[in-house]
Amino acid sequence: LCFINNQLKQQISAVMQRSTLKVITYNIHKGFDSSNRQFILHGIKDSIRQIDADVVFLQEIHGERNISNNRFDDWPSNNQFEFLADEVWHHHAYGKNAIYKSGHHGNAILSKYPFVEWENIDVSLMQSHSRSLLHGTIEITETRQHVHIICVHLGLFGMERQRQLAKLASRIDSHVPHDAPLIVAGDFNDWLGRAERYFAKDLNVHEVFKLSHGRHARTFPAWRPLLSMDRIYSRGLELVDCQCLHGNPWRKLSDHIPLMAEFAIK
C-alpha cells in the first residue's frame, strides 16, 4: 500500500510539474561576451540548463562559422543550437537570417516538446540587414494542445522595425487561430516601446512584463541594463511568473540578459 501511495504521489507530482510551460528568450551574441573577446558559449549552456525551461528562444546564434573553428579550442564540433540543445531539448528549429562567407547566424528555438511544423519567414528590408521570424507550432505531449511560438529579432532602424512589426502582426493574424495559445519572444530592439500598437488592440497579444509590472523589463546592456530590448508576448495563456534574470552569471555572458516567463497550460 505504501508503494502504491508513493507511486500515486510521484504521478501527481509529475502532472503538477507538467501543468506549466516555462520559456526563456536570450540574445546570445553569437556565443561571445560583450567585448567580443571571450567565447562564453559553454557558460551560456550551463546557465540556461539551470533555468530548466521547456522552450528556449535564441537570437544571434551561429548555424555555421568556419573561421572561429580555428581560433578557439573550445569551439563546439557541431553547430551552436545543437550544442546548446544537447540532451535536454530534443527538438529544435533554426532559421538563418544573416549569411556571409564564413557562415551564417540567425534565430533558434529549443523545445522539450515536438514540433508539429515550423517555418522561417524573411522580413528583411535590405540585403545588408537580414532579419527573419522563426514561427513554429509545438504539441504539449500530455494534453495534445498546440502552442504557436515565434522567435523574433527585429532591425535597428525605426522604419525597418515598423515594417517588420507590421509583417509579424500580419503573420499572427493569418496563421495563428484566434483561440490558439501563442508566445512571441525575442530581441525587438524596441527601446521606444512602439510594438504595442501592433499587438494589443487588434490581436489581443500582450507583453508579460508590462502586464504584470507596468513596464517592460530592461535587458541591455547586460552589465547595466537600461534599455528594454527583449520581450515576451503572449495570448491565450495564463501568466504564472515572469523574471528578468539580472546579476551573475548573466551580466558576464552575452551583452543582453535573458527573460523568463511561466504559463499555465491546463
Language model feature labels by segment:
Residues 16-23, 105-107, 111-116, 129-151, ...:
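Beta-strand-turn-beta hairpins that frame and shape the catalytic cleft
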Residues 95-100, 124-125, 245-249:
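Short, solvent-exposed loop/turn elements at beta->coil junctions and helix N-caps
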Residues 101-102, 126-130, 158-160, 250-253:
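Solvent-exposed loop/turn segments connecting transmembrane beta-strands
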Residues 30-33, 63-66, 100-103, 157-160, ...:
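Active-site environment of divalent metal-dependent phosphoester hydrolases
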Residues 23-28, 47-72, 110, 136, ...:
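Active-site beta-strand/loop signature of hydrolases that rely on acidic residues for catalysis
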Residues 3, 8, 13, 137, ...:
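Metal-dependent phosphoester-hydrolase catalytic domains
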Residues 86-88, 102-117, 224-240, 264:
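Conserved beta strand-loop-helix elements of the APE1-like EEP
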Residues 2-87, 94, 99-104, 166-167, ...:
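N-terminal, active-site-proximal structural segment of metallo-dependent hydrolase catalytic domains
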